[in-house]
Regions:
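Surface-exposed amphipathic alpha-helices with a cationic face
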Residues: 72-83, 140-153
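Active-site metal-binding loops of divalent metal-dependent hydrolases
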Residues: 55, 162-163
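Structural detector of well-ordered beta-strand residues that form the stable sheet scaffold
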Residues: 88-89, 159, 203
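Short, solvent-exposed loop/turn segments at secondary-structure boundaries
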Residues: 60-65, 132-136, 178-179
Length: 213
């Protein structure tokens, strides 16, 4: 993702970053062609492909979990054919908005199971709210693990492909600033919690303070 305007099934709803960007593709063949072109160009250079960004949020994905699982399976087949050593990581889901998480993630996992697990890893974004810290992130990871256990999912790797602290929201929660010794201790705590909850990879977004340029 995102979906280009010309291949969007709908231009309604979110306009980020362009109209139709969160829409399911009108032509899945165009999706196949896109994946084929990317993997053909970067085979041997890109070692892992995440299928979609934050598909649990309507601003990034307005299709269904079933449709996202279909895109995942199609991409998996192409990637494994063109570059068998590359890893396929499922569409990421945020956790801090519980309603969005519950609406997307369990159904997506069930749809992946129905397709015989066309992923090498699952992806979450474990941001807590702007006023919360590592303990709250750990609760988010515990929820992910509980959900996977409840659905009797296999022992697939879980990657935290985007997280940080102080991100504004949800709602009117302002952004926070974590610096100095607090930042140092939170980074250490974060990686220890990742180990504790079996999170194989942890990616901070991003390390620099605002402005990002």
């Amino acid at each position: 993702g995102p979906t280009p305007v010309w291949n969007a099934s709908s231009l309604k709803g979110t306009q980020y970053p362009v109209p139709g960007a969160a829409s399911e593709p009108k032509s899945v063949q165009a999706w196949d062609d896109f994946v084929t072109a990317v993997v053909g160009r970067y085979a041997g250079q890109i070692t892992a492909y995440q299928i979609w960004n934050e598909a649990s949020l309507k601003m990034f994905w307005q299709g269904s979990p079933e449709q996202m699982a279909d895109l995942t399976e199609r991409a998996y087949r192409i990637i494994k054919d063109k570059d068998p050593s590359a890893l396929v990581v499922g569409a990421s889901t945020t956790v801090r908005l519980l309603g969005a998480f519950e609406r997307f993630f369990p159904a997506y996992v069930e749809e992946l199971a129905a397709r015989d697990w066309p992923v090498d890893a699952l992806a979450v974004h474990s941001y807590p709210s702007g006023a919360q810290g590592p303990l709250d992130r750990a609760r988010n990871l515990r929820l992910v693990r509980h959900t996977l256990d409840r659905l009797d999912a296999p022992d697939l790797p879980v990657w935290d492909t985007e997280l940080n602290y102080g991100l504004a929201g949800p709602g009117d929660v302002p952004r926070g600033e974590i610096v100095g010794d607090q930042a140092t201790s939170w980074v250490a705590r974060t990686h220890l919690d990742s180990m504790r909850f079996g999170v194989g990879r942890t990616y901070f977004y991003i390390w620099t303070p605002e402005p990002y340029e």
